[in-house]
Amino acid sequence: MNSASSASASERLGRAARRCRAALSVFALAIAAAASLYPGGSWTEPGAAGFSPLRNFWCDLVRTQAINGADNSASRRLSCVAFAALACALWWFWPIAGALLPPGRGALLQVLGRISTLALFAMALLPSDAHPVWHGVVALAGGGLGMTCAALCCIRCPAEPRYSLRRASAYAALLLAALNAALYIYVAYVHGPETPLQPGVQKLATLALVLWMAVTVRRALAERDLSGAAAR
């Protein structure tokens, strides 16, 4: 790669990193605001007030009507902003994560990752109360692709320590997402009982995802700076 193309790639990486971080910040603020405005009700406590991280799913926030029967318009609007921001963050994240991998694997990651991101957009447009079947299908398809991407990212970078926060958070995101998907299938399709376990696992999977994204962006920028210093 010549110096001009290398500089261009470095600029693209930096631009994607800034956008990814900004979108993650919007997601965190918007999802917190949406949760604070949720009227109440969960599948295990239909008459409860407010949003419970251990009893409510994120998709409860995008319902037109809360589970307790109250209007959920305000929370729905903010949660749609939150999930759109997360989807944008992921859209810019996949090329960043791919930059740490061998070229062929990185290109595959970018394609699969961006397809899974489109599924996240679709989930916001297909709330579970209005489209229960399609919401589940899109969630499982997008989640499966996302888990494949996380597995691709578990590979160790050349200069990376054997045990790193980037790889540990990727493994955590992968395992928690797999457990969340298994619990979803058990409840939705095998008709298992509703418990606080799945909503709790979902929140842990989200935290692991955000941590993995943040650490990966930092790692990619550090690798870029090292490469730039070596080239000078």
Where are these regions (language model features)?
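N-terminal signal-anchor transmembrane alpha helix
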Residues: 14-44
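Cytoplasmic juxtamembrane regions at transmembrane-helix boundaries
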Residues: 89-117
